[in-house]
Amino acid sequence: MHRFASLQGLKADAEEWEDLEHRMKDAFNARFLHVKEGTSPVPGHTLYPDSIFYGNNTVTANILPLAFGLVPKNYINEVAKNAVTSIITTNKGHISTGVIGVQWLLRELSRRGHANVAYLLATNKTYPSWGYMVEKLSLI
């Protein structure tokens, strides 16, 4: 909204909307962002990121704040790595999001440097996956 107000030359409105945006981000992060730095067995390793995650640490809980620009800049890579870790280790390369998360999943993985994981999800043919549905259920 602050961008629209700025485009219209409404400086006071733009400042008010920008302030509200920052307060909303701060409140969201205060409630849902969990930061437990220094807990990884192998710091910096892709499969063992520090415990920096959102909500209940599901793929969707981590992907949506990335997609909506809510993650503080210094935590973006770690939140993305945490989503990748869940996909690879917990979900064994399978999609675990519902309709809300899946629409942002491949886009955010690719945007954050994990296009290989997005490709894995898109091409996986074991259950549960899109490839499995295409191969097994296309005759129905």
Where are these regions (language model features)?
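Active-site core of glycosidic bond-cleaving carbohydrate-active enzymes
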Residues: 1-140
